[in-house]
């Protein structure tokens, strides 16, 4: 059976300190990822706080804000939490922030993070997440997957 899946992805990115154009140019990603350079530029050039169709069935909304200001409830299926670690940005790894994430996820929604610190795991569990340790990507021994359960 060969049926075409036609799902749409609505990706919401929340960033308090975005990379500016000069910094982006210095990274030289256009020359590194040549085949996707136009998409990369489109993602960085599109306006903040507005939904953009990046590709057919892929929509991006970049929100210029702190996650602590997010008030969406039961809206997201997945959160990719790729902040600097708790040692560098302890304010992003608190029960307060994880409760906001828990509330913003739909039932059975998933949060993933490269941080596998015990304090992170405990804070996720304390707000209601079911937390699992997973094998990490190259360079990381472990990562965490937290699922919103009742």
Task: Show which residues each predicted segment covers.
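A short SAM/SAH-binding and catalytic strip from SAM-dependent methyltransferases
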Residues: 77-91
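Conserved beta-strand signature within the Rossmann-like core of class I S-adenosyl-L-methionine
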Residues: 78-80, 107-115
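Conserved SAM-binding loop of SAM-dependent methyltransferases across substrates and taxa
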Residues: 1-6
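S-adenosyl-L-methionine
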Residues: 23-73
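Conserved SAM/SAH-binding beta-strand->alpha-helix loop
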Residues: 17, 117
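Core SAM-dependent methyltransferase catalytic element
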Residues: 127-150
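A short glycine-rich, Lys/Arg-flanked "PGG" loop and its adjoining helix->strand segment in the class I
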Residues: 91-108
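Conserved SAM-binding motif I beta-strand of class I
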Residues: 10-15
């Amino acid at each position: 059976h060969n049926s075409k899946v036609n799902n749409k992805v609505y990706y919401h990115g929340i960033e308090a300190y975005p990379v500016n154009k000069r910094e982006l140019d210095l990274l030289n990603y256009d020359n590194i990822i040549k085949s996707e350079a136009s998409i990369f530029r489109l993602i960085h050039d599109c306006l903040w706080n507005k939904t953009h169709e990046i590709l057919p069935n892929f929509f991006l909304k970049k929100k210029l804000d702190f996650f602590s200001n997010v008030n969406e409830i039961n809206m997201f299926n997945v959160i990719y939490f790729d902040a600097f670690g708790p040692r560098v940005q302890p304010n992003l790894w608190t029960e307060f922030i994880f409760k906001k994430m828990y509330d913003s996820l739909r039932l059975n929604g998933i949060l993933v993070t490269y941080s596998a610190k015990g304090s992170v795991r405990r804070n996720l569990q304390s707000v209601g997440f079911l937390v699992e340790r997973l094998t990490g990507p190259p360079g990381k021994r472990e990562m965490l997957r937290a699922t919103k359960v009742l």
